[in-house]
Curated annotation (Swiss-Prot):
Keywords: S-adenosyl-L-methionine. It comes from Archaeoglobus fulgidus (strain ATCC 49558 / DSM 4304 / JCM 9628 / NBRC 100126 / VC-16). This is Probable S-adenosyl-L-methionine-binding protein AF_0433. Pfam families: FmdE, TrmO_N. InterPro entries: FmdEsu_dom, TrmO-like_N, tRNA_methyltr_O, UPF0066_cons_site, YaeB-like_sf, YaeB_N_sf. PROSITE patterns: TSAA_1, TSAA_2. The lineage of its organism: Archaea, Methanobacteriati, Methanobacteriota, Archaeoglobi, Archaeoglobales.
Length: 366
């Protein structure tokens, strides 16, 4: 057996002094933690400030190295350490993806690290959402023991897609899962790509982004249908029998889960457009907290009904035609009398408030 030697490259300065004070996962830590790199390794930090997120590997020096079976915090059953994230393991190497807030010489200020104060640092690497992120990754026993973890995983994916967590992107995730479970539809990306299931949304707000992430149904794969009805509602349909489940949420009813300060900031920052940068940042924090709450509100807050939908044709393949004015190719169905719709001066677009008519210069036609 090979003897592996590691060199400590730095140390973590953390507000967490013992296991009981640290969060179960660094991702849920809101504290700023400092990573001090030793002088002889300072050159290794060149260009690190260009990275937004880092992978930090550290040595869990207070762990039990004899453990091979553990009972994790979110399950009552025993599991092998290699199937868990337990700090107690033969080679206790900790792993965290952190946000780099600032570099000050040899000190990196980060957020998202749950390591204890004084923990040795083994290595640091840049994190890439393109290379490192696996959107459909699961821990089977964990999701079995914690049904809520599926919603958590989907909402974190929705955050990457939507840009932030807010109440209605979370409601889109929650409503999608409710509809799919009621319909007996498994989470399967190929089902949406093959148009075996369709998602019919009745709004074009944040909720729709949550639906796209949770169902895999998008405009681009022709499995998302938008009805310009202005309702917070979603229908998931099986193409094989056109049976579906429609889920509706009353926005007025869920407002009781919003804090008074969050609502006041929303009106100031979003409705009146009067907020400062600090107001916007504070609203974002409130919105994320409220978004997580939306995953836990009673299912009775949602109106759920089984429906049947009239058959909808699969997306056909159309030939292209060349516009006689601009010379560009356009779908044949969008060329009238030799002109593309833009050159003809009349077409429709989806904007923030729904479907509107534009002229050739993208001016709204009233």
């Amino acid at each position: 057996m090979m003897l592996v030697q590691l060199r400590q490259v730095g140390v973590i300065r953390s507000p967490y002094k013992n296991f009981s004070k640290a969060p179960h996962q660094g991702r849920f830590s809101k504290e700023t933690v400092e990573i001090e790199i030793f002088p002889e390794f300072e050159d290794g930090l060149k260009d690190i400030e260009t990275c937004t997120h880092l992978i930090v590997l550290y040595w869990l020096d207070r762990a039990n190295r004899d453990a091979l079976l553990v009972v994790p915090p979110h399950d009552s059953r025993e599991h092998g350490v290699f199937a868990t994230r337990s700090p107690h393991r033969p080679n206790p190497i900790g792993f965290a993806v952190v946000e780099l807030l600032e570099r000050d010489g040899r000190v990196l200020k980060v957020k998202g690290l749950d390591a204890l104060d004084g923990t040795p640092v083994v290595d640091i690497k840049p994190y890439s959402s393109t290379i490192d992120s696996v959107g459909n990754a699961k821990i089977g026993w964990f999701e079995e023991a914690n049904p809520q973890s599926k919603l958590t995983r989907l909402l974190l994916r929705a955050k990457e897609f939507h840009g932030h967590i807010c109440p209605f992107v979370a409601l889109g995730v929650r409503m999608s899962v409710i509809a799919m479970e009621k319909l007996g539809v498994e989470e399967d990306a190929m089902a949406s790509v093959g148009e075996d299931i369709l998602a019919i949304v009745e709004c074009n707000n944040c909720l729709t982004d949550g639906v796209q992430v949770a169902t895999g149904c998008t405009l681009g794969n022709n499995s998302l249908i938008y009805l310009d009805l202005g309702k917070n509602a979603l229908t998931i349909v099986r193409r094989k029998d056109w049976k579906g489940v429609r889920v509706y949420v009353n926005a007025e009813n869920v407002r009781k889960y919003f804090s008074k300060e969050a609502l006041e900031l929303f009106n100031k920052v979003i409705v009146r457009r009067e907020g400062s940068e600090e107001d916007a940042k504070r609203l974002s924090e409130f919105w994320e907290e409220t978004g997580w709450k939306m995953l836990e509100i009673p299912e009775e807050e949602f109106k759920v009904e089984f429906v049947e939908v009239q058959p909808i044709e699969r997306a056909p393949i159309f030939e292209n035609k060349r516009c006689e004015k601009c010379g560009e190719l356009a779908m044949a169905t969008r060329v009238k009398d030799g002109l593309c719709l833009r050159c003809a001066g009349s077409y429709y677009a989806v904007v923030g408030r729904g479907i509107v008519k534009f002229d050739g210069e993208m001016r709204e036609v009233v």
